[in-house]
Amino acid sequence: MSARDKANRVLIHFILILVSITMLVPFLWMILTAFKTMTEATSVNPFVILPSTWRWDSFKEVIENMDFLHLYINTLLLILGRVVCAVLTATLAGYAFGRLNFRGKNLMFSLVLFQMMVPGQIFIIPQYLMVSKMGMLNTIFALVFPGIVTAFGTFLLKQAYMGLPKDLEEAARLDGCNIGQTFLFIMAPLTRSSMVALGIFTAVFAYKDLMWPLICNKDVMPLSAALAKMKGQYTNNYPQLMAASLLACIPMIVLYLIFQKQFIEGIATSGGKL
């Protein structure tokens, strides 16, 4: 290895370490603050990093006062609803755009790409009016509604299907499979990694969605909305706020650790052919 290659490798590792530290510091600060007293959490002394005593009172108060189990159930229903709907619709639409030929295909997919470039806040008022007229306000269905179809999911699965060889479909036709059988038994299983990646993306977006739950649903509140309501106008109990935030982070961390292999494979496969 030449001196230039060594220097480039050192520079790359230095940048990666710097980026990792930048991303981990807020998370570590959240963990440490959750165990501190209010005085320690608001101290301006730069040397007060670790708590004097590791207190679990903030976690106990948050669990008792916020009914975390009920919030977890609401959030779980929200995530399951959006993930199932998004993966199902994106798989069907992605296969149609990626493997089938029909009139208006390019125009329709251009509209999908255009929707990806439009800020989601623009659709909030039309979505609210639709949910209101369908009588779904203050129900779990109102939370799931915006995630039934996603332009990003359609694009992701389309790229995954385009990366599969055409020989598979030709072999399936020779064996007597129709379009539905080819899709269900041959093509769809090969894009499982992309489906998992889309499911994780959808779960994360649903988990941190704040504006829509606050607008359309006051009775069935997910974790994101409950955390937002903990923040006061003039004062905040930072240890309790950080304890609640830490408890809210745990499911997403566990989800990613379980499916990180499929997540990386799905992104790599879908981005292999643009």
What are these regions (language model features)?
Residues S2-L274:
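A structural signal for multi-pass alpha-helical bundles of membrane permease subunits
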